[in-house]
Amino acid sequence: YIGYRDYNMRDNNIKDNHGGKSRQSTKGQNSWLIAVIVVLVLMLTIGIVVTTLAYIGGARFSSISGKSSFGGNSVAVLDVQGEIGDVSARATYNHDWTMHTINELIDDSSNKGIVIRVNSPGGSVYTSDELYEELMKYKSETKRPVYFYFQDQAASGGYYIAMAGDKIYANRNTWTGSIGVKTGTLYDVRGLLDKLGIKTNTITSGRNKAMGSMTTELTDEQREILQSLIDEAYNQFVTIVAKGRNMSESRVREIADGRVYSASQAK
């Protein structure tokens, strides 16, 4: 019998399907102490040890305390919701928490695999790749499977991380793909500053140190530099997709023009 354990940060509940029980802490009520005693008795009876929760800003920051025992085999369920970025306190996806949780699961002998639910438009190249590598490490060291389920969207970085999955499932209304890399928008406000009578001065150690500045023109050389960085990241993306989907790189390049695909198209 293999249950599931939800490690997500969306609410203050701990959920499992061992015995069909769910537990939620209540505060400020006269029955609080009685409820806690009853829950503890039930947990001891069925051999479940509930891990300690720490909360930061109302969000669950960690659901693992040391080498926790779940009292039986289980599959971890993780959510990747929102932009995949390296911001520990973001309200949706928490990169530090996710990386820590996956690393802890490696040493959890009761864990038998991971299911990741994705609803993300993507994120930074760095954090997407770091999460992908952590999942590949988990698979390599544990020989356990990783499954993905695509919800509303799993695009760009959200698709990238799924290349670590053994299997991918998607809602029929999912939008995915968007295989590509881009810089942030580069603005040129020199014309506006001229109209306002504002002049700027920047002292640099080299002609390309200030490239991308809103107050200087992007030269052909600088455009080539930025394009080379984008191309390098794109080539890495293509390689990851080719490996994860068992496709040739040439075929991936044919379809990886940045567009999104429906679930049926991506299949």
Labelled PLM ranges:
Residues 4, 10-144, 153-244:
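Small-residue-centered hinge/linker elements
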Residues 147-155, 256-259:
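Glycine-rich beta-to-alpha transition loops that act as phosphate-gripper elements at the mouths
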Residues 237-267:
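Secondary-structure end/capping motifs
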